[in-house]
Amino acid sequence: MERESSELRSNADLRGAVAGEQILMLNDVRMRIAQVADLVRSNGWSSLFKEVLFLKRTAIVVEKDLSELTERSKPLASAKLKLLEIDKEMLSSGLYSFAVNSRYLKALNYLKHGCGGYALARDNVVVGDTWHYVSEAADDPRGLHEDLQRFGFSSWSKDYVYTFDIFVAPAERKGGISAAFQNSAMLALRSKGYTKAYGFYWADNIPAHWCTRVTNKWKEVRAFSVSRCLMFKRAVPLRRDQAAHKKEPSWLKNIPIGEKKGI
């Protein structure tokens, strides 16, 4: 009888584990579908193909010494926005909804993979989110985030943090909100003991360039030529002279500085 009872418990545990995996897979599928739908709805089918099929797109890897940060809360306070930490309790509380549904599904996925995040919220609606990944100090690159591996990082410090996928709802992208959100999230990470942040942006993403490099003064570490075909990516380091002429479209160079800031 005891043996039969043990076998029944084992079978029940196995069925529970399989069901849990199926739910996670279903959430991943839902996230991908919602993400594609949002992208196509906002920017058309061409934007989708641009994200999953491209050749030699320039990625700029950047770093920020978090000791250089200064408080800049006015843009968020003026827009009645606040910074919140995203964790399982926050998502499961039912107190907050996401302005863009695919970002909620992404949040579930990122938390499942051990990432941390911060939300930009007005009242109980999340209008922006940004994510980070912490690796233990290691000399084995296999323990690093896949982006860091792709960009040639071979070691890491426990005081460093990798930041990625900052998003602000289109209706909120004005008055320096995106840059202030990024700055506030970095201040929050500094308060946790991190001393340096790394990230990357695409050279053809002009708003990301102005938010990260111009307003928040992140420093360039290196540049890569990245090609992607669906799930497969390849990154090749660029020499500085190769990267320089690819960072800013020629049409933008003729726009006065004051007008660029309004992009």
Q: Each predicted region: which residue ranges?
A:
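Acyl-donor-binding surface of acyltransferase catalytic domains
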Residues: G16-A107, H113-C115
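Conserved catalytic-core motifs of GNAT/GCN5-like acyltransferases
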Residues: V62, K219-K233
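Conserved acyl-donor/pantetheine-binding loop and adjacent beta-alpha core of acyl/acetyltransferases
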Residues: N109, H113, A121, V125-V161
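Conserved acetyl-CoA-binding loop-helix of GNAT-fold acetyltransferases
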Residues: D165-V168, K174-A188
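Conserved GNAT acetyl-CoA-binding A-motif
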Residues: R190-Y201
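Conserved active-site alpha-helix within GNAT-family acetyltransferase domains
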Residues: A203-R222
